[in-house]
Amino acid sequence: MCEIEPENLAKLIAPSGFYNIKSVRIKSFCEAIAAKFGDFESFCELVKRPWLRKIKGVGDETCDSILCYACGQEVMVADSYSARILGAFGYEFESYDELSEWLSELDFKRVFSVCGADDVNTAYCAFHGLIDEFCKAHFKGGKFDEKALRLFENLR
């Protein structure tokens, strides 16, 4: 990735939007990983949140997504979908960190059994993935559809 020209990378990531800016940032990010950690395996093993947050373009959710999904660390990704679902039950959070901490403190025993997870990272990935898939299917135009609202009502 460090060797690819930003223009070529931009073509590969074009469907993600803002691809010209993202291609430069991704290339810079890969170069920073190579300079600091040498290789991807070392990066995954040694990287910490503060280092990632210093990278231009890496916000809280992106940082935690990298730690959870790419590095396999025990980090629960909190996102706007999570906040929306919890908001439907009356929960409000003042910051990303507050939401992330709340989600991390949930009892994941049920998630472990449902998804067959044998470690915390797998459970976090599965739980976050289920939240995203649910909201992609049932959150449109800034609101939940009737099916989601009925489900929420049954869960109260």
Q: Where on the chain are the PLM-derived regions?
A:
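Catalytic cores of DNA base-excision repair glycosylases
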Residues: 2-156
